[in-house]
Structure formats: structure tokens, C-alpha cells
């Protein structure tokens, strides 16, 4: 290369240094000073990664003094360049020597980089275009946020997330039965809200015992990095902000923390977009005395736009508390408990109409009359005729049924606020097999009960019943050696024998009290050396996690995990299928929670429920009531709480006194009422609610689409190629897995999210679900998103020169390929990407300016191209400049036509969708007060904002490739 003092060059490998000046040429070496950074670089003259900077006529060049010149003539003298032209401000004729050009000039625009000789490798141009196409595909998908989480494609979960996650500020109660995956539904909704920009700041309130579990679950399944806040963390955060909640975007904390007025005030002032409350059935309320927990959540729900309440038992703690939770979501809608009860009485007619529509038979007169009355403002006659017709396409009939069903669900009841799936409507659960094991009552307990009976005159019947259910507690109360009960308790003998005969099985044991759990662990360890671990509320979160992990280990882990009632809440152990109930809780909901630790979606085996009970005691009588009255061991019992409240007095009496006639009478009454409630639930609101909650055929279609995306081999190829280009080491690890590691030759100094010691990944959902240590890669995964951002956010691939070997074309024929981006700058929360996502517009010009992009497929064209040495490419560009400048202007015109067409479509789509949504909401609001005015106002404002953003849309040249035909 011919170097001379004062010449301006740019580094091909360190463009951030700015413009360099040759300060020394000696022998085979050349030294450049980069004044913008004050750094020197020495290069070999023969192989210097440098490009000579020479501007062209019509370019605007800035001097180091700050003024600019529009170049009209370029003169070279003594190997240095002088630019003649017009002063950009005064209009005077001026000259500018290259030594006086601004040191900070960066060649960011593709055309500037091309003319400056900063030409990328051919494959980088291709990967940049593929990245832009992938970003466009992801942003324009209505499945955004559902594809990436490491969860099974379970219809009702994905359906609820799809319906709720795309709303503005959703306010809903997720009330699926135990084991149906409410945490996953909440995670999917949060993931969707964050990816679509509808939410940026989220506060999750969970029981203290579940904080760490939520933290791990959100990271492992959804790649959401929450921070756990407790009092210590709040104190530490003062160094960064007076309000600790402003130091993180995604926060998990307990209700205990927010009971403190100072912390609650700070949380109220923290501008959250979404509030999530787990175990919401603990929020007790009465009109006169709402609980402190309820008041905390109520205060937050008044200032946070979006609210998700999670509860497995909507009526636990009473129907009034269920109403109170709905009141948190929409106090204007649920303003009066009596009015709510009156409204519920009208649900049966709606449910009957929905039942008729969800079948396949023709509608009877009663169903038609109900539909006509319920949908009086709609013209439903055409749909009715279609359903009743004989020779009509079944798909059309089904569409008519679905349409009317959707109208019905939209207009009546709590369908938009409450989602509740039951096991009856969700398939795939194992059987529950109940195994009672009667044991003889130890004499020590008989004596303790006799003594207690003489001393318990003033105790309430419920207190007496609870004592009768735990004879070991009574014994401990009267004996100094509180630990000795497990030495003679026949249930402990049975438990040891059972574990010894099932050594290869994992067994979950649940007892009411933490002290009982600890004593059982001691008994197993000291009497037989059985490996067991304990799980109770007195342990820290980390201690509980370690215990759970020890139990989960297949080879060296504990055979048994012994949990207390409270300690096991919210924890799931589907890998075990044997459950031992060492005692029974005096609440059918708590019994269901115990069984729900194993009876969940994902359980592969039938669940064996074992109950060692003491014969002739309160334990046996409670077992009979649960088993023969409620069938609560082998089936879920949604009416359990109602039945318990109704028969609490009789049940308590039977538990305290052994009266066979009273027991028989109680069982008869319970069975009769159980059947009544079961039939009423079948007829009433639950049926309608479940039709809306599980999504039916629409949910199945959604799952089919997600499964098709899982099988997209094109995505796998694109992502692997992306990692290849960036320089990520990829090692095939077998079993559909790859190990990714940073390498020393990566394009970028760091790859955020890629650990130094590597990470194992898979593109296969089933593989990811079977192993927690493997990341599930989809187009939504941070490792993919980061890769796309690294490429598209840098200059990688913005310029390229290639040779087309095609003898059908004259040698020297020139093509210019331009990739423009439709650039509509708008905040993510505006949802503009739904109508105008970042869209690449490809223009392929021949030398006459004709656009061949629609005639010449990109992939076919790409296959015919060959790379060109960078120095040769630079010379080819310089020689072709007279042709390239007018072609660039022509390309801008062609791309503008493409943008105009995109804008027309985007505006039409936006207007059509939002107008339809607004009209739908307005129609619904007239008949269903469940529609909030904020939702309507949001749609109106969104239309106005989006029109403004579309008006301001511009074209951005993203990449440029010059192609020359060669016959060599």
C-alpha cells in the first residue's frame, strides 16, 4: 500500500478509533495516530487492515473546526487529497485538506462504509438479512410470548395465557383446581406482557415459603430474572435509591414485608404495571373487618393497572371472600355482595344455552328461546338457521355454534375476569388409588385421652376434635419425654415396614405439625437407618430447596420426604407416586392440597395414597367421612368446603364421641348433599366458566400452531448459523443437545447471557422439559434475542461485494442489492409492531435501475455468489462509483414505494382491528358491566397514537451489496 505522511485512513478492525492519520512510515511498518482517542497503532505496510478514506463529489465532509464542506472536486497532490467545494453554512467556495478533516468521523451508514472500503465478508451480509427477517417474523406473530417458555403445550394453560396476556392491563382471577398449573399460566401471561411491551415493571407477592421457588421457576421456565426483596434487601437498596423497589424491574416479595407501612408506601409509589398475588385464598374479607393482608393487596390493586390473583379454591374461606377477590379486580363491577348473589342466580339459563351450543345435536325450542333472550341485541337468526339445517357443511355449523357461544361468553357473567378449569374438563390425569391401613390404638394413647377427657371441660368442640385427631400431641402434653411417642406408635411401625418394602420408590409423607415431621425423621433414622429429609415452615427457603433437591436425586437421594402441612404448600413432587398421610387435616381443602403435591399435570403414574390410621378413633371416623361422604381421596371435591361448613357441627361431634348411629346419619346426609351439589355444579355457572377457560377447539388449534413452530427446522439452521458467524463454540452433546461456549475469536468482546463455562441447550421441547439443566432454545430465548441484537445493532454485514458467475449475463454486469428497514420509532408499549413490525424491504437493481427483487429469489441468488478479497472489492467499488450513486437514489425511490404500501396495509389493519375491538367492547359494555371503561379509553388513545407513529415512519438503509458478473 502507498502510504504518505498526513494521509487519512480508517482501521477495519477498530472503527471505533475514528479517523487515523499517518504519522510515520519506516521500512516495512507504518504508524497511525487516532486523534479522537489519542491512541497510536503500528501496522505492517504489506498487510495493514486499513482502508484509505477519500470522499467523493456531493459528499458532505466535516472539518476539525466544526464547519462542513459539500465536495464538488477532489484533487490529489503529493499523495495527499484536497477537497474543493461549498461551505455548508455561508455558501462560499472553500477548500479542505484531508489532514484537517474531523477526527471523529464514523462511517455508520452502509453506503459510507462501502465507499470508505469497509467491506464485510459475504456471509455476514447474509446473516444480517436473515436476522432482520427473523426479528420481523417474531414481532409480527400473534404467538409472541407463548413459544419460548420451557413448558408443555397444554391447551388450557396456553389458551388462558393467549387470551389474558394480549390484553391491556389484565385484571383476572386464575382459579384452576389444584395441579392444573396456575403458576405456569401466570408466568406465560407475564412473559407475554413483557415481550410485547405491555408491562415493564412487575411485582409478585407470594407466601414467604414460596419466594425462592417462584424465583427459580420464573428463571428456569420463562427466562425472567426476578429479584427477591426482604427487609435486608430493602435496606441495602437505599444506597441506590430512596425507594428500594425502584432498583429492580421484576420483584418478588412476601405479604409480611408489605404489612409494614413504610414498605407498603414505597411499593405503592413504585409505578408497577402488573401485580401478581399467589395463594390469594388467604385474603380474608368481610364488609366490616377486612384482614390486613386484604387491605395491603387492595391498596396496591387501586394503583397498579394490571392484577393477577392466583387461587386454587375460589370459595375457600367462604363465598364472601371469593366476591371480595373479584372486588379487588373491579370494585365498580363487584360493588355489592347481595347484588352479586342475585346475579349468580341467573347463570343457570346461560349455562343451559352454552351447554346446548357446545353439543352436536340440533337446538330445541327452549335453547333457541334462551339464546334469543340472552342475545337480544344481536341478529342470531342466520346462525340458528345454519345450526338447524340438515345439509350444511359441518365446519360451517361448528363455526356458527362457536360464534354464538363466544357471544354468550362475552356478554354474560365473569368470563373475562375469572378463569377456572377443573379436572373434569382437562384430560391426562392419573388415577388416585386410596389404601387405608388400620392400626391398633396404643395403650399409652388410650391413657392420655382418658386423662385429657377429665381436664377438657371448657374446651370448644373443635379444639377437642383436633386433639382427638393427633393423639401423639396429647401424649406429649402429659409426658416429660416428648419424643418417645414414635417408639410405640403403631403407625410408625407400619411406616418403617412400608418404606423397607418399597426401597426403590420415592415416598412423600405429610403430617399436620412440624414437630411430628421432625420426630418421624428421627424415628426412621434411628430405628432403621432409612434416608429421609424434612420439610417444614421453620426451615429457611434455601434449606427447603436443599431438602427438595436431596429428595429428587435418583441414586444418592433420600427415599422419603417428610413435610408439615404449611411447609409443603405450593411445592410439587410429581416424580413421586406414593403419598403417605400420617394424619388427616380437619379441612377437605387441605386434604386436596396434600394430594395435589403429587396429583398434577406431568404425573406419569397412578397415585397411591396411603393412610395409616388408629382403629376406633377420630382418625377412622374422619377418614370415613372424607372417603364415603366426599370421595375426597380418589376424586377432587370442589364442593368440599361447602359441605364442611354445612356439616361442621355434626362432624365435630362425631369426632369427639364414638356414636355409630350419628356417624351413619352424618354419612347419609353428606352423601345426599354431595350429590345435590354435584348436580347443581353441572347445571350451573361452572359449566359455562369452564367452556371459556379451557378454550375448546380454539385452544386445540392454538396448540397445533405452537407445535408446528416447534418443528420449524429453518429456525434451527438460522440460529446455528448465527452462532457460527458470531464465533460461539458449538459442541454436539448428543440426545438433541448442544454445548455452547464463548470462544477467543468471537466477533464481539462479550455475549451477554452466555456463561464463561458454557451452557447446554436444545431446540427440542420434550428434551428441555425432561432436564432442568438444559436451556430450551426458541426464537424468544435471550441467547437468540441477544445474538440478533448484536448483529443488527452493529455494523456487521452492512456492506458486501460479491461475484456472480453466470455466463448467461455479460461479464462486468453490475447489480446493487439494498436492504432497507421500515423504521417507525415508537415505544414498545404502543404495540405498533403488531401492524408495522421492523420490516426488511429488499431492492435488487440492475445497472438501468430496474428493481428485480420480486423476480429474483434471495436464496437462489445467494447460492450463485462468490466472495471477493476485501482489497479487490474496494477497488471494484471505487471503479463503479459513477454507476452506484444514481442507483442508490433509484433504490431509495423503489424502497419508498415499498414503505408506502406497507403503511397503507398497516393503517388499514390497525384501523380495522382496533375499530372492531372498540365496537365489540362498546357492545359488550352495554350488556356486560364486566368491561372496564379504561379498556375502551386505551383503545381510543392507541388508535390516535399509532396514526401519529405511522405518519412519522421513515426508511433506513440497513445493508448494501454490490454484485458483479464474472466468467472467470
Swiss-Prot record:
Residues 491-641 form the Helicase C-terminal domain. GO terms for molecular function: ATP binding; DNA binding; helicase activity; hydrolase activity, acting on acid anhydrides. The keyword Membrane does not apply. It comes from the Bacteria. GO terms for biological process: regulation of DNA-templated transcription. Belongs to the SNF2/RAD54 helicase family. RapA subfamily. It is an enzyme of class 3 (hydrolase). Residues 163-332 form the Helicase ATP-binding domain. Keywords: Activator, ATP-binding, DNA-binding, Helicase, Hydrolase, Nucleotide-binding, Transcription, Transcription regulation. InterPro entries: Helicase_ATP-bd, Helicase_C-like, Helicase_RapA, P-loop_NTPase, RapA_C, SNF2-like_sf, SNF2/RAD54-like_C, SNF2_N. This is RNA polymerase-associated protein RapA. Interacts with the RNAP. Has a higher affinity for the core RNAP than for the holoenzyme. Its ATPase activity is stimulated by binding to RNAP. A motif (DEAH box) lies at residues 278-281. ATP binds at residues 176-183. Transcription regulator that activates transcription by stimulating RNA polymerase (RNAP) recycling in case of stress conditions such as supercoiled DNA or high salt concentrations. Probably acts by releasing the RNAP, when it is trapped or immobilized on tightly supercoiled DNA. Does not activate transcription on linear DNA. Probably not involved in DNA repair. PANTHER family: DNA ANNEALING HELICASE AND ENDONUCLEASE ZRANB3 FAMILY MEMBER, SWI_SNF-RELATED MATRIX-ASSOCIATED ACTIN-DEPENDENT REGULATOR OF CHROMATIN SUBFAMILY A-LIKE PROTEIN 1. Its EC number is 3.6.4.-. Disulfide bonds: none annotated.
Amino acid at each position: 500500500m502507498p502510504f504518505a505522511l498526513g494521509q487519512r485512513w480508517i482501521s477495519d478492525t477498530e472503527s471505533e478509533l475514528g479517523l487515523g492519520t499517518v504519522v510515520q512510515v519506516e521500512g516495512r511498518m507504518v504508524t497511525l495516530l487516532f486523534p479522537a482517542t489519542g491512541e497510536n497503532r503500528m501496522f505492517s505496510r504489506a498487510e495493514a487492515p486499513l482502508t484509505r478514506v477519500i470522499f467523493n463529489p456531493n459528499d458532505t465532509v466535516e472539518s476539525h473546526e466544526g464547519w462542513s464542506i459539500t465536495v464538488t472536486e477532489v484533487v490529489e497532490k503529493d499523495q495527499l487529497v484536497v477537497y474543493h467545494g461549498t461551505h455548508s453554512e455561508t455558501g462560499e467556495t472553500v477548500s479542505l485538506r484531508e489532514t484537517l478533516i474531523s477526527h471523529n468521523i464514523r462511517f455508520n451508514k452502509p453506503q459510507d462504509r462501502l465507499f470508505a472500503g469497509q467491506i464485510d465478508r459475504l456471509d455476514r451480509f447474509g446473516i444480517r438479512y436473515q436476522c432482520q427477517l427473523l426479528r420481523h417474523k417474531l414481532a409480527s406473530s400473534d404467538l409472541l410470548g407463548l413459544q419460548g417458555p420451557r413448558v408443555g403445550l397444554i391447551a388450557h394453560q396456553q389458551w388462558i395465557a393467549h387470551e389474558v396476556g394480549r390484553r391491556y392491563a389484565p385484571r383476572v382471577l386464575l382459579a384452576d383446581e389444584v395441579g392444573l398449573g396456575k403458576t405456569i399460566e401466570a408466568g406465560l401471561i407475564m412473559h407475554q406482557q413483557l415481550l410485547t411491551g405491555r408491562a415493564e415493571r412487575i411485582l409478585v407477592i407470594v407466601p414467604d415459603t414460596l419466594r425462592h421457588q417462584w424465583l427459580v421457576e420464573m428463571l428456569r421456565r420463562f427466562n425472567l430474572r426476578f429479584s427477591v426483596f426482604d427487609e435486608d434487601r430493602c435496606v441495602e437498596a437505599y444506597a441506590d435509591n430512596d425507594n428500594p423497589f425502584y432498583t429492580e424491574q421484576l420483584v418478588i416479595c412476601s405479604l409480611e414485608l408489605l404489612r409494614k407501612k413504610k414498605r407498603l408506601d414505597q411499593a405503592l409509589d413504585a409505578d408497577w404495571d402488573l401485580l401478581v398475588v399467589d395463594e390469594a385464598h388467604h385474603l380474608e374479607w368481610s364488609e366490616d373487618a377486612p384482614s390486613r393482608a386484604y387491605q395491603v393487596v387492595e391498596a396496591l390493586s387501586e394503583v397498579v393497572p394490571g392484577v393477577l390473583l392466583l387461587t386454587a379454591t375460589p370459595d375457600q374461606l367462604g363465598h364472601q371472600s371469593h366476591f371480595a377477590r373479584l372486588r379487588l379486580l373491579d370494585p365498580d363491577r363487584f360493588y355489592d355482595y347481595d347484588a352479586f348473589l342475585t346475579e349468580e342466580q341467573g347463570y343457570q339459563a346461560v349455562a343451559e344455552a352454552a351447554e346446548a351450543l357446545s353439543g352436536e345435536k340440533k337446538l330445541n325450542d327452549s335453547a333457541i328461546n334462551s339464546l334469543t333472550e340472552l342475545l337480544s341485541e344481536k341478529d342470531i337468526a342466520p346462525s340458528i338457521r345454519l345450526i338447524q339445517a340438515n345439509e350444511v357443511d359441518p365446519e360451517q355449523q361448528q363455526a356458527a355454534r362457536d360464534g354464538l357461544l363466544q357471544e354468550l361468553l362475552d356478554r354474560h357473567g365473569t368470563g373475562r375476569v375469572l378463569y377456572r378449569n377443573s379436572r373434569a374438563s382437562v384430560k391426562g390425569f392419573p388415577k388416585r388409588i386410596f389404601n387405608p391401613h388400620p392400626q391398633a390404638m396404643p395403650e399409652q394413647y388410650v391413657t392420655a385421652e382418658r386423662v385429657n377427657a377429665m381436664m377438657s371441660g371448657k374446651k370448644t368442640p373443635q379444639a377437642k376434635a383436633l386433639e382427638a385427631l393427633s393423639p401423639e400431641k396429647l401424649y406429649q402434653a402429659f409426658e416429660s419425654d416428648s419424643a418417645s411417642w414414635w417408639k410405640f406408635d403403631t403407625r410408625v411401625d407400619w411406616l418403617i415396614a412400608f418404606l423397607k418394602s418399597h426401597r426403590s420408590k420415592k415416598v412423600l409423607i405429610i403430617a399436620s405439625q412440624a414437630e411430628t415431621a421432625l420426630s418421624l425423621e428421627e424415628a426412621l433414622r434411628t430405628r432403621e437407618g432409612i434416608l429421609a429429609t424434612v420439610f417444614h415452615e421453620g426451615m429457611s427457603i434455601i434449606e427447603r430447596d436443599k431438602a427438595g433437591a436431596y429428595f429428587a436425586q435418583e441414586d444418592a437421594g433420600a427415599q422419603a420426604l417428610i413435610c408439615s402441612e404449611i411447609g409443603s404448600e405450593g411445592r410439587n413432587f410429581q416424580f413421586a407416586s406414593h403419598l403417605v398421610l400420617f394424619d388427616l387435616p380437619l379441612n377437605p381443602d387441605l386434604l386436596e392440597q396434600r394430594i395435589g403435591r403429587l396429583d398434577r399435570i406431568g404425573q406419569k403414574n397412578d397415585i397411591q395414597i396411603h393412610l395409616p390410621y388408629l382403629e376406633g378413633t377420630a382418625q377412622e371416623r374422619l377418614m370415613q367421612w372424607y372417603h364415603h361422604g366426599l370421595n375426597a381421596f380418589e376424586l377432587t371435591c370442589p364442593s368440599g368446603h361447602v359441605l364442611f361448613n354445612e356439616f361442621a357441627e355434626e362432624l365435630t361431634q362425631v369426632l369427639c364421641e364414638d356414636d355409630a348411629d350419628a356417624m351413619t346419619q352424618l354419612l347419609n346426609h353428606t352423601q345426599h348433599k354431595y350429590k345435590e351439589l354435584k348436580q347443581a355444579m353441572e347445571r350451573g355457572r361452572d359449566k359455562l366458566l369452564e367452556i371459556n377457560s379451557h378454550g375448546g377447539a380454539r385452544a386445540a388449534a392454538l396448540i397445533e400452531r405452537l407445535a408446528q413452530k416447534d418443528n420449524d427446522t429453518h429456525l434451527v439452521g438460522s440460529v446455528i448459523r448465527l452462532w457460527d458467524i458470531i464465533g460461539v463454540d458449538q459442541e454436539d452433546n448428543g440426545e438433541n443437545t448442544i454445548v455452547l461456549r464463548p470462544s477467543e475469536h468471537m466477533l464481539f468482546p462479550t455475549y451477554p447471557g452466555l456463561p464463561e463455562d458454557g451452557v447446554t441447550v436444545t431446540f427440542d421441547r420434550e428434551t428441555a422439559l425432561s432436564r432442568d439443566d438444559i436451556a430450551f432454545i426458541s426464537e424468544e430465548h435471550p441467547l437468540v434475542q441477544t445474538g440478533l441484537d448484536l448483529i443488527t445493532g452493529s455494523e456487521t454485514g452492512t456492506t458486501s461485494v460479491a461475484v456472480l458467475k453466470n455466463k448467461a449475463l455479460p461479464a462486468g454486469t453490475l447489480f446493487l442489492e439494498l436492504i432497507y428497514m421500515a423504521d417507525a420509532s415508537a415505544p414498545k408499549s404502543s404495540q405498533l409492531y403488531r401492524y408495522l413490525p421492523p420490516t426488511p424491504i429488499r431492492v435488487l437493481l440492475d445497472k438501468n435501475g430496474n428493481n428485480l427483487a420480486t423476480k429474483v429469489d434471495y436464496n437462489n441468488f445467494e447460492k450463485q455468489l462468490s466472495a471477493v478479497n476485501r482489497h479487490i472489492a474496494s477497488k471494484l467499488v471505487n471503479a463503479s462509483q459513477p454507476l452506484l450513486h444514481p442507483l442508490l437514489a433509484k433504490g431509495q425511490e423503489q424502497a419508498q414505494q415499498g414503505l408506502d404500501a406497507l403503511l397503507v396495509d398497516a393503517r388499514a389493519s390497525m384501523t380495522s382491528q382496533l375499530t372492531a375491538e372498540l365496537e365489540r367492547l362498546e357492545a359488550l359494555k352495554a350488556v356486560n358491566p364486566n368491561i372496564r371503561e379504561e379498556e375502551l379509553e386505551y383503545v381510543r388513545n392507541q388508535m390516535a397514537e399509532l396514526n401519529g407513529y405511522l405518519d412519522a415512519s421513515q426508511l433506513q438503509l440497513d445493508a448494501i451489496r454490490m454484485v458483479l458478473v464474472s466468467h472467470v
